[in-house]
Amino acid sequence: MARKEFRYRGYTLEQLMNMSLEELARLLPARQRRSLRRGLTPEQKKLLRKIRLAKKGKYNKPIRTHCRDMIILPEMVGLTIYVHNGKEFVPVEIKPEMIGHYLGEFAPTRKRVQHGAPGIGATRSSMFVAVK
């Protein structure tokens, strides 16, 4: 079975690429639409400039950013952006399904807790067990 072509609210990726930010904002959910209408912050503009240069092939270094609140736009699709999670830069490969989400959603800030085996004294019943 062939893979279904990606569409965002009925528009193909090519159609989304040709849209202006204002036209794209109309398709996004309210929070993202409101954020785009307020305008991009200087950090977001700097990141967008780097992304556009990388797409043209003029920016060779990996794109690293602390800007977790940047909305993923169609022009970012296909790039790998390194997003800071508070400790290190996590590589995020942008796919068409991510359009409209924030970069920070794909770089978790907290590690999942992995508990080891409980030690002596961890439970009431193991308090009085001889240690050897």
From Swiss-Prot:
GO terms for cellular component: cytosolic small ribosomal subunit. GO terms for biological process: ribosomal small subunit assembly; translation. Pfam families: Ribosomal_S19. The keyword rRNA-binding applies. Coiled coil: none annotated. GO terms for molecular function: rRNA binding; structural constituent of ribosome. Signal peptide: none annotated. Belongs to the universal ribosomal protein uS19 family. Protein S19 forms a complex with S13 that binds strongly to the 16S ribosomal RNA. This is Small ribosomal subunit protein uS19.
